[in-house]
Amino acid sequence: VKTLKVGVCLMAALMLCGCNPLMTASVRNLKSAVIGPDELDVSAAQVAEVKYPQIKLTTPSGSGVLALVREREDLQFWVASGKQVLLLRDGLAVRTIGLGVEGDLDGTRLADNAPFKRGLHQVADGFTSQRWIDLYKGQEVGLIVNSRFSRRATQTLQILDKEYTVLRVDERIDVPAIGLRATNHYWVDPLDGFILQSEQQLTTQLRVRIVQLTPDRRHLP
């Protein structure tokens, strides 16, 4: 069932890539792992030409634009091409396909008290939680991720040609089983907790930056 659902998303992505220069450029850039990162320039006019919500994704191997092609309750499927898929749940990256050179994030399960569902704008300073992740390479399943949240200052964030007032929330994560420690950053709408931009460590080798290019279009048309 999981394979079928992802397959439907990939077909939609191929149609997008075939008719939109920006999406085609995204495919090329995200495949640039051999030669290193290549930043993709995105304009507001290019984004406006695509009716689907879009994000800009930057990885250690490149950057590109992904389109939202499917929603299942709070789970969103963002796709760039036939080999790159990012699944977000309330702004948290929970699975990747074709993004990790040394292996992908294969799954994520959140604790009942995880603050992403109700919004990080409400998280208390020093709040702790857990989640469990599966890694594609190494067959590591159910690794515990301990996290501690810190509220930071309100900032002004510019996305394309617009400015947004956001609250920065940091998440210190610790995955003892693989010796991973890192700090994730989330820039959220202080009114409803929507994550406009984030930097997330997904595996030991895969750190991503996610920017919502269409904050006013959060769901499929």
Q: Where are the regions that the model predicts?
A:
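Bacterial N-terminal signal peptides that target proteins for export
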Residues: 1-9
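C-terminal motif of bacterial Sec signal peptides marking the signal peptidase cleavage site
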Residues: 15-18
